[in-house]
Amino acid sequence: ERTANKASNQSSAASGKSKKKKRKEITLEDYLPIDKIANGVIYTTDHRYVKILEIEPINFLLRSAREQQGIIFSFISYLKISPVKLQIKMISKKADINKHLEQSRLEMERESDPNCRQLQKDYIQFVRQLSSREAVSRRFFLIFEYEPFNVNRKVEEKEILAALETAAQTAKTFLYQCGNDVLVHDNEDEFTTDVLYTLLNRTKCTETPLPKRINQVLTRYMESGREQEVDNIHINEFIAPESLDFKHSNYVLVNGIYHSYLLVPCDGYKAKVMPGWLSLLINAGEGIDIDFFLHKQPKDKIQQRLGQQIRINRSKIKDASDTNADFDDLDSAIRSGYFLKQGLANNEDFYYMNLLITITAGDLEELQWRIQEMKKLLISQDMDLRSCYFLQEQGFLSSLPLVNLDKKLYELSKRNVLTTGAASCYPFVSYSICDDNGILFGVNKHNNSLVIADIFDSKQYKNSNIAILGTSGSGKTFTMQTMALRMRRKGIQVFIIAPLKGHEFYRAARNVGGTFIQISPASQNCINVMEIRKVDNSVNELLDGPTLDASALASKIQRLHVFFSLLIPDMSHEEKQLLDEALIKTYARKGITHKNESLIDPKHPDHYKAMPILGDVYDVLMETEDTKRLAHILNRLVHGSASSFNQQTNVDLTNKYTVLDISELTGSSDLLTVGMFVALDYVWDKAKENRTEEKAIFVDEVWQLIGASSNRLAAEFVLEIAKIIRAYSGAGIFATQDLNDFFALDDGKYGKGIINNCKTKIILNMEDEEAQRVKTILRLSETEVMNITHFQRGNGLISTNNNNITVEFKASNLEKELITTDRQELLEILKRQDKKVG
């Protein structure tokens, strides 16, 4: 019996072999087998040196069979040169989203709009509820120890540290080939200490993070007048739990949290497994930790023992009848022996592997339920799982990241495997995205982790662009608006260009204090496409000094050529030249030339001169016979049904949430594309003003500008935005539901260009033909394609940083009210509104 309780302000443990013996109390500082942590290495009390690496996992199960095979082969290459003993540890716990919530609270305090503050309050409550129900976080560690080449030779500490660092770099190189990154920490000692503290203080580490715990210990020393001892405080005082209780046969109490240790016995494995089969255990859920041990054996000794055992079994089988039960066992043993012998002859190594499973819970009933569920899970896979009865203390010590599996547990659970078998246990398989400063997308359907991504974090994402692909009714608009609202909640400038069903964006814009600008023949709103806009370059000048004096007129005329090419697709080269001359003449009549000083209004130096409008271009074009055809086509926008385009700009883009609705132009396909370009041109000018301010431009149905109904000039303009918006701290979110048109222009050059310039892709439900097309472009596996064709509304695949995850997109009730288009949900909202009025 061994117990440990907090006493006299110091953690302590009591141990004894019988109840008659007087129990001897020892401090937890002495009990934990850790001497110190220095140079990023754990120095153990039995004079070993242990290194911990944290590994970033990948989404192995969604990779194609060919990719999975490549990963396994890369892992085999690592195992060939890895340390003799390896411990791979996975810990799971409730996701700690406190940093994300704290960031959200700070953003709410900075918000001035009351409606937006309500949205932020609702978001915080929603994320908290979601995380309490289903959010699980997982961390993966690779642990190894220093292995002396010659046990008789005395080795200096610097040689040991150098050897461990070399082993760490080797692991980093080979795991990178698997697709895994080894996380680099600014302070390795702090990282290692935090890992141990987290393991030993499951719930307390959330309430009392390590820095706070350190302060508490230091304060205790200072208050008790022991200032001179502060520099010599043992590391275990900072990381040790307050209490340990080993009195029970099938569980341990650590700080009041129940821990039960189980193992897979020697004969508890399946004979044949799939690559990455450990994901079954790794994704089992909250409170399930996995420790996977590998111990490489000397090949020469194993070959000798194998030969002896095969000969013994062959002599035994001669005396056994083929109807005897022993005959089958001996036959199987001989076959296994020859299999191992053949593998060793083919340059494979021989390992003993062990699986130790830790199950944690807040109370005994929950612990027992989790144990039973875990056993059922393994039985369903033809595997066995046994509790470490009366060996719980050994299980506790073995689960520490010290590469020190207890001998009894080792003998009970060791299973022999060759290198290929060991590599099939590739464990870094459960990828998750959880950025403290990001926005919530939803829940990872494979491992129940929250998907919170900060697309503006340039350290993680090469660019902030997102491509959203999905068929009609797949939830594309819903996903877009959820993202837009959450970006607005963070204070990010949001622009939305809506060419179809613009009314679906109105309710959300109105309820967050946004601006809804409708560009249509019947609307009073107008963006003057001829306007050379005064750009605020103050931030850019502070950063770079005086800007280059490039001609603003030349830049504007270049974009006007795109506008007129959309309006008049069949312009000849001669007409393009004549149009160019007409545009220069139009601006000249307003006193504007290629010199930027000519833009300044002498009466109001802070403003530009009055700009020409399309009617002024029309007048110039009507003056010569060769340009009258162009004038007649332009006439619709000057004197005809679309004359609302023939005004000075009367809209403002300073609002943090701006929707430009051009859906009323859908009656004329050429006008819709023209209107979409005008809106995007105006937004792009605004987005380039301040390179330090985050902004997002949402372009719905982008196929209108880069597809068959557009032309190369307009498509190049959109592609250029996708390429360089990152330089202006911006994100381009491009959505489409018509993949055939999206990839139609120039054999899909511009559609592929947009995809390639979006680090993150969101693929919603698609028809089989569309999914096959995307499969080739995004290099998706058959499993992913099958998922895409069967996705329910609100589910999708997020592809980012070479990982694909299946996500259920989540929205709070308030967000749903603002963006839903579902008829039944709209009726319920209407009923609630009627009750309020009543």
Language-model features and meaning:
Residues 725-742:
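Sensor-1/coupling segment of RecA-like P-loop NTPase cores
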Residues 41, 53, 58-59, 65-81, ...:
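P-loop NTPase motor domains
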Residues 49, 140, 493, 656, ...:
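The start of beta-strands in P-loop NTPase/AAA+ ATPase cores
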